């Protein structure tokens, strides 16, 4: 067949030519359709997640005596199911090298309810028991992925809690969950704006009941952008020092209540276990611990939101808190400062408001490096050195402010270079030395010629 079009010379088109053209057209459209589908899926995910956050509301509960008894049964049954199936998994692995997963254990749970010896677990919400098995599955997953230690058995002294995965509602200052048709009196001090998902009911050592309601909601009013960046150095003398020289004091709540707590614990040790006096004194000790925990959390919330409000990019050190606690001289102070909790609060608040938290590598010698010329002063490894002067550029440094400035510079450079997260310490040291070599050589040359 011969084709001629728009004045071009006539060409002969064979069957092979038709097939070649047809194949190219199909391939072209298929490739572009695939690309469009990928882009469309990404846009759908982005639009669906845009402005949505998961938020937890915590409210105080005031159950009556009958409800408190039923809550106690829920706590006990959830703990029993968790321990029963943890023991089953351990025995199965010991005998066969394998163990049941969640789905197999859920079937076993159904059979367990039919047995006369364990029929009492039917008195509580079935979904609560299923969630206990799910929690065990998550604990195993975290262990295998090296995010946590191997799961332990729960004792009566462990945190009393259980989770209801669905059918949760709050109305007229009452919490409605399965098995509690009349609702539990609840102090709803904040409006719940999102869609309620699961709820976790807990009892503190001081005897107070709380519900943590998990929601998904739209975050309609993110904080305004400031176009400002900051570096944070976390310490023990002061909790935080910013690259602008601002300090957030370390309130040392454990030390503040140390004498009161020691006195209360001393009185507890003199009481007879099981007596009414022992229980009353135990509650006093628990309330002091609760006061310390609540005061610390309140202060950390205030510090974190203050920083997120004022800065768009926040650079911090990725500290190995667990490793630092091995220093028995500092372990108590590090625990009291609660750096890990602060970083968690800072991160999710920044995420909610479209701000960025950059974690720089722990191997970066932020306290030893001059932020002006890059000279590394090994003498400042000694924590008692709070101020020092650079022998190269003669800049006077406050140890903590200098560290915060270096953290800021390193974090911003990491963003621009696309190397925020490092995993290899040797690679970090090599990059640091390479990046500072030119600065150091220029500084030493100027010193020699000066």
Give residue spans per PLM region.
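Short acidic-glycine loop/turn motifs at beta-strand connectors
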Residues: 171, 205, 243-246, 373, ...
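Acidic carboxylate diad motif detector
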Residues: 103-204
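Positively charged, low-complexity nucleic-acid-binding target-recognition regions
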Residues: 26-28, 32-49, 54, 332-333, ...
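Substrate-contacting helices/loops that form the catalytic groove of nucleic-acid
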Residues: 95-118, 196, 204-343, 416-450
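Short polybasic amphipathic segments
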Residues: 168, 173-179, 238-242, 386-389
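Gly/serine-rich nucleotide phosphate-binding loop at the start of the catalytic core
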Residues: 19-22, 27-29, 34-129
């Amino acid at each position: 067949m011969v084709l001629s079009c728009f004045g071009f010379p006539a060409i002969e088109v064979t069957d092979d030519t038709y097939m070649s053209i047809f194949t190219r057209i199909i391939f072209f459209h298929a490739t572009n359709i695939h690309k469009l589908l990928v882009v469309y899926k990404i846009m759908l995910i982005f639009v669906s997640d845009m402005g949505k956050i998961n938020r937890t509301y915590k409210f105080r509960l005031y159950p009556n005596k009958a409800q408190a008894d039923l809550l106690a049964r829920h706590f006990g049954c959830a703990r029993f199911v968790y321990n029963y199936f943890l023991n089953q998994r351990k025995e199965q692995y010991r005998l066969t090298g394998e163990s049941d997963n969640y789905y197999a254990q859920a079937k076993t749970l159904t059979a367990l309810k039919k047995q006369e010896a364990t029929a009492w677990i039917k008195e509580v919400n079935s979904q609560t028991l299923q969630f206990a098995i799910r929690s065990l599955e998550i604990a195993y997953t975290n262990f295998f992925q090296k995010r946590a230690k191997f799961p332990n058995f729960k004792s009566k002294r462990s945190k009393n809690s259980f989770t209801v995965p669905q059918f949760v509602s709050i109305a007229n200052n009452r919490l409605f969950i399965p098995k509690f048709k009349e609702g539990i009196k609840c102090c709803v001090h904040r409006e719940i704006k999102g869609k309620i998902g699961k709820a976790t009911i807990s009892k503190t050592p001081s005897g107070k009941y709380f519900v943590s309601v998990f929601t998904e909601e739209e975050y309609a009013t993110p904080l305004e952008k400031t176009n400002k960046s900051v570096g944070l150095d976390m310490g023990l003398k002061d909790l935080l020092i910013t690259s602008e020289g601002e300090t957030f004091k370390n309130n040392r709540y454990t030390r503040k209540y140390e004498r009161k707590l020691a006195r209360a614990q001393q009185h507890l040790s003199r009481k007879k276990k099981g007596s009414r006096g022992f229980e009353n004194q135990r509650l006093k000790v628990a309330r002091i611990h609760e006061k310390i925990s609540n005061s610390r959390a309140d202060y950390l919330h205030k510090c974190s939101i203050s920083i997120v409000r004022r800065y768009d990019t926040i650079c911090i050190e990725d500290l190995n808190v667990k490793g630092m606690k091995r220093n028995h001289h500092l372990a108590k102070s590090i625990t009291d400062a609660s750096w890990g909790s602060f970083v968690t609060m800072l991160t999710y608040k920044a995420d909610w408001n479209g701000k960025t938290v950059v974690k720089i590598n722990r191997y970066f010698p932020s306290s030893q490096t001059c932020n002006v010329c890059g000279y590394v002063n090994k003498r400042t490894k000694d924590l008692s050195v709070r101020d020092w002067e650079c022998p190269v550029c003669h800049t006077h440094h406050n140890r903590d402010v200098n560290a915060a400035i270096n953290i800021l510079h390193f974090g911003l450079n990491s963003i621009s270079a696309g190397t925020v997260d490092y995993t290899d310490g040797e690679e970090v040291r090599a990059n640091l030395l390479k990046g500072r070599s030119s600065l150091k050589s220029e500084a030493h040359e100027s010193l020699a010629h000066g």
